[in-house]
Amino acid sequence: MISQQFPKHVENQWLALEIGNSRLHWALFMGESLKFTWDTEYLPESVIQQLGNGETNWELGTGEKGISSSTFPPLPPAPCPSGSQSLMGETPKTELSHPLPLFIASVVPKQTALWQSYPNVRVITLDQIPLNNTYPTLGIDRALALWGAGMSWGFPMLVIDAGTALTFTAADGERNLVGGAILPGVGLQFASLGQKTEQLPQVEMAEIKSLPPHFALNTAEAIQSGVIYTLIAGIRDFTEEWLSLFPDGKVAIKGGDRILLLNYLQALYPELAGRLIVEPNMIFWGMQTIVAGVA
């Protein structure tokens, strides 16, 4: 691991930003404590410049040049004084003399480049994560999630990330990367069938209220059946293989589709579902250990 000097925290607060394939994922830390998380769409360069000038949601407003509070929640620019509301409620309007330190983990280089104008930014890279046996093209999101989960619940650890892609990433008890797998996630599989074929309909996630029949009698449910049951079978296969290799190993799941897939696993394989650690913020915990210098 390469040691690196990180920017000084302003009033012990700092921002973590995971730039994903579809959205931005944010966290506000106070020291080592995670206080608040939220998601936004990708932000225009003008808004990034405003944030870099220390302007919070209160100053950004809701006009064409700003961003609404529904998209970017208020960030307290200083620790809440006695008598003020918590981070989850209203916070005092105070101007930042300096923008909060920002630590970025990104899998989208074009988006990363936009944030270089932010004056107090640091991009976390793979060589800063103390995993052994990594390879150069291992995604920073996979590595940080694995590191965060392992440091929180112990190694050996298998992390399942149910996002745009469904990924499996594992490390043994000595923090050596065992390896993993990548396949299209739930939404991407539905989208590919809907967009790349002439007659198959686009199935939306919101349309799925319960497990479809295995052998469907209409096209929409046939697509649901094919995607869902093969994904669940894949999760079961990888998890069982992992536990056969590492009987004392742990399995954690994250990602935007984690609850959907967990519900299906609970219905079909409740014992297996009961072994899963459900934690959406593994990447942020991994970032926190890197920022704090914990290894």
UniProtKB/Swiss-Prot annotation:
* Record-listed ATP binding positions: 18-25, 164
Active-site positions on this chain: 141 (proton acceptor)
Which GO terms label this protein's molecular function in UniProt?
ATP binding; metal ion binding; pantothenate kinase activity
Keyword annotations of the record:
ATP-binding, Coenzyme A biosynthesis, Cytoplasm, Kinase, Metal-binding, Nucleotide-binding, Potassium, Transferase
- Residues where K(+) binds: 161
What does the cofactor section's free text say about binding? A monovalent cation. Ammonium or potassium.
**Cofactor(s) needed:** NH4(+); K(+)
Q: In which pathway does it act?
A: Cofactor biosynthesis; coenzyme A biosynthesis; CoA from (R)-pantothenate: step 1/5
The UniProt annotation places substrate binding at 135, 139-142, 219
Localisation? Cytoplasm
Q: Which Pfam families match?
A: Pan_kinase
State which Enzyme Commission number(s) the record gives.
2.7.1.33
Chemical reaction(s) catalysed: (R)-pantothenate + ATP = (R)-4'-phosphopantothenate + ADP + H(+)
Q: Name one GO biological process term.
A: coenzyme A biosynthetic process
Q: What class of enzyme is it?
A: transferase
- Which Gene Ontology cellular component terms are annotated? cytoplasm
Name the segments for region: Disordered: 71-91
Name the principal localization, coarsely classed.
cytoplasm
For this chain, the family text in UniProt reads: Belongs to the type III pantothenate kinase family.
Do you know which HAMAP family this protein is assigned to? Pantothen_kinase_3
Q: What does the subunit comment say?
A: Homodimer.
What does the record give as the function of this protein?
Answer: Catalyzes the phosphorylation of pantothenate (Pan), the first step in CoA biosynthesis.
Protein name stated in the entry: Type III pantothenate kinase
